[in-house]
C-alpha cells in the first residue's frame, strides 16, 4: 500500500510527504473502514469483492471492491483493472457475503470493459464493467443496486454510505475475519472539494483543475474510504431507495482533515454503462 500511497502524493505534488507518511495515527481515532463499523449481512447486497489469483498465497485474493448493477454486471474502478486488454479469466468475483474469505464459490468473469477515456484515476473516467459468465442468483444477500440517474441531485444533506474491506487506517489493514465495513459520509460540493485539494497541495496546481466534472467528493474527518476499497460503492438514499452515486477512485491518505475522498461520479457514466450492457448482454 505504501507504494500506491507514495504515487498518490507524488502525482499531487504534495509537500512534507515524509511527515504525512510517518505521522502517528491513534487506532482509537481510526477504526473500521476508517471511522466505520462492521456491516450487517444483507444490508449492502450489491457489494462484491474483486479477486485475482496469487501464486504466493495459492488463493484468489481481494484487490478491489465493486457493485453488482445487474445480475450479470459489476461496476468497479478502471484503475483496479488497469489494462484495456485485460484477460477476463484473470478475475473472480465474490458476492453475497460480508466475510471476505467466507465463500469458496467465486463467480467467473467473461468480459472486461475499461472506459475508453481512462488514462489514470486523476484524469477521470475511472470506471470499468465486468460481465459475469453466469448471472448471479439474486437473494436477500445478492441484489443489484440502482444507478444514480441524471436527474438525481445529490447534496451534502443526503444520507450516503461507503462500504468495503480495505485498510482501516493509513497504517493498518483490516484484521481477520475480514468483515465488510460501512461508514456514513457526507457529499462535498465539487467547488469546495477543489479548493480543499488546492490548499492541500499548497496551490501547486493552480493552473489546472483537480476535481473534474465526472468526479464526486465525500468524506469527513476521521471517516473515509481507504486503499482496499477502490472500486467499491458510495450509495445515497434518493427518494427512499439506495442509488449508486460514486465508485471509490482516489484521495490523499485516509480520512485526513478537510480532504474528502474522490469518487467517479456514476451519473456521468450512465449512458456509457447502459450502452455497454445493451451491447454485450
Language-model features: where?
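Conserved active-site neighborhood of the chymotrypsin/trypsin-like protease fold
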Residues: 74-78, 124-149, 281
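Protease-domain processing segments flanking chymotrypsin-fold serine proteases, especially trypsin-like
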Residues: 1-75, 92, 214
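A structural motif
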Residues: 46-51, 74-76, 128-131, 158-164, ...
Amino acid at each position: 500500500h505504501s507504494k500506491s500511497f507514495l504515487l498518490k502524493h507524488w502525482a499531487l505534488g504534495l509537500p512534507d510527504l515524509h511527515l504525512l507518511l510517518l505521522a502517528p495515527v491513534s487506532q482509537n481515532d481510526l477504526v473500521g473502514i476508517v471511522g466505520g463499523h462492521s456491516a450487517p449481512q444483507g444490508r449492502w447486497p450489491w457489494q462484491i469483492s474483486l479477486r485475482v489469483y496469487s501464486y504466493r498465497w495459492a488463493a484468489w485474493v481481494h484487490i478491489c471492491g465493486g457493485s453488482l448493477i445487474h445480475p450479470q454486471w459489476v461496476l468497479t474502478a478502471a484503475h483496479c483493472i488497469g489494462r484495456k486488454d485485460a484477460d477476463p479469466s484473470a478475475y473472480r468475483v465474490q458476492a453475497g457475503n460480508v466475510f471476505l474469505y467466507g465463500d469458496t464459490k467465486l463467480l467467473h468473469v467473461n468480459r472486461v470493459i475499461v472506459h475508453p477515456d481512462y488514462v489514470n484515476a486523476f484524469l477521470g473516467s475511472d470506471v470499468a464493467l465486468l460481465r459475469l459468465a453466469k448471472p448471479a442468483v439474486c437473494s436477500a444477500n445478492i441484489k443489484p443496486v440502482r444507478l444514480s440517474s441524471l436527474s438525481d441531485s445529490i447534496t451534502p444533506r443526503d444520507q450516503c454510505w461507503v462500504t468495503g474491506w480495505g485498510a482501516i487506517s493509513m497504517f493498518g489493514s483490516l484484521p481477520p475475519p475480514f468483515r465488510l465495513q460501512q461508514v456514513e459520509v457526507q457529499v462535498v460540493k465539487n467547488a469546495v472539494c477543489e479548493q480543499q485539494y488546492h490548499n492541500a497541495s499548497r496551490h501547486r496546481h493552480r493552473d489546472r483543475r483537480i476535481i473534474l466534472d465526472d468526479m464526486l467528493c465525500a468524506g469527513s474527518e476521521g471517516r473515509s474510504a481507504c486503499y482496499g476499497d477502490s472500486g467499491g460503492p458510495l450509495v445515497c438514499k434518493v427518494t427512499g431507495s439506495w442509488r449508486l452515486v460514486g465508485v471509490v477512485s482516489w484521495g490523499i491518505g485516509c480520512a485526513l482533515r478537510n480532504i474528502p475522498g474522490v469518487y467517479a461520479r456514476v451519473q456521468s457514466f450512465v449512458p456509457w454503462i447502459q450502452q455497454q450492457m445493451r451491447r454485450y448482454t
